[in-house]
Swiss-Prot record:
Substrate binds at W99. Belongs to the WrbA family. Binds 1 FMN per monomer. Its EC number is 1.6.5.2. Residues 4-191 form the Flavodoxin-like domain. It catalyses: a quinone + NADH + H(+) = a quinol + NAD(+); a quinone + NADPH + H(+) = a quinol + NADP(+). This is NAD(P)H dehydrogenase (quinone).
Length: 200
C-alpha cells in the first residue's frame, strides 16, 4: 500500500484548509494510506496568539525522521517574500541526516501554497521549494493542465501547473475558493495515483 503524507505549515488557516482538501483528493485513490500532519510552530505561543496565528490546528506535528516512511510527500506553505515560510524551512533544514542516507531518493515530492495577493509569489514559492526536493532526489509532481480549474478565466483564482495555490487577500480575509479547493483535491489525487503506481 502506498503511503502519502500531506505536510504543511499554516499561520492563519488558509494552507490548513488547502491541506485538508489535498488529503481528501489523495484519500479518493484506492490502496493509498494518507496522513495529514503539520510542521512545528517556531513562534512562541503567546506571541503567535497576539498576532492572530491559528495555534489550535487539529493535525498532529510531524517529526523529521518519519518522512522516510512515505512514498510521496505533498508539502504546503504560505509565501514569505516568494519563498517558503520560515517554519517549513527550519523543518527541512533538519533533514540533513535523511539526505546523507538518501532516504528520500525516488520518492514523490509535490508542493501547494498560499499568497496574500494575486501576484504575491505563489509560483516562485513552489519552484524555489522544488530546489530542496531535488537535492533530496525526489521526483517532482505538479498539477497537469488536464485539471480544468487551471484554465478558469471566470474569476480571480489561484492554481498553477507547479501546484495548487490560494489567494488569501492582503488582510487574510479571503478564504480558498471552490475552484482552488478543486485544484487542491486534484493535486492530492494525482500524486496518490502516481505513488500507487510506483509502489506497485
Amino acid at each position: 500500500m502506498a503511503k502519502v503524507l500531506v505536510l504543511y505549515y499554516s499561520s492563519y488557516g488558509h494552507v490548513e484548509t488547502m491541506a485538508q482538501h489535498v488529503a481528501e483528493g489523495a484519500k479518493s485513490v484506492p490502496g493509498v494510506e494518507v496522513t495529514l500532519k503539520r510542521v512545528p510552530e517556531t513562534i512562541p505561543v503567546d506571541q503567535a496568539k497576539a498576532i492572530g496565528v491559528k495555534v489550535d490546528q487539529a493535525a498532529p506535528v510531524a517529526t523529521v525522521d518519519e518522512l522516510a516512511n512515505y512514498d510521496a510527500i505533498i508539502f504546503g506553505t504560505p509565501t514569505r517574500f516568494g519563498n517558503m515560510a520560515g517554519q517549513m524551512r527550519t523543518f527541512l533544514d533538519q533533514t540533513g541526516g535523511l539526505w546523507m542516507k538518501g532516504a528520500l531518493v525516488g520518492k514523490i515530492g509535490s508542493v501547494f501554497a498560499s499568497t496574500g495577493t494575486q501576484h504575491g509569489g505563489q509560483e516562485t514559492t513552489i519552484t524555489s521549494f522544488h530546489t530542496t526536493l531535488l537535492h533530496h532526489g525526489m521526483v517532482i509532481v505538479g498539477v497537469p493542465y488536464a485539471c480544468s480549474g487551471l484554465v478558469d478565466m471566470k474569476e480571480i483564482t489561484g492554481g498553477t501547473p507547479y501546484g495548487a495555490t490560494t489567494l488569501a487577500g492582503a488582510d487574510g480575509s479571503r478564504q480558498p475558493s471552490a475552484n482552488e479547493l478543486d485544484i487542491a483535491r486534484y493535486q492530492g489525487k494525482h500524486v496518490a495515483q502516481l505513488a500507487a503506481k510506483l509502489a506497485a
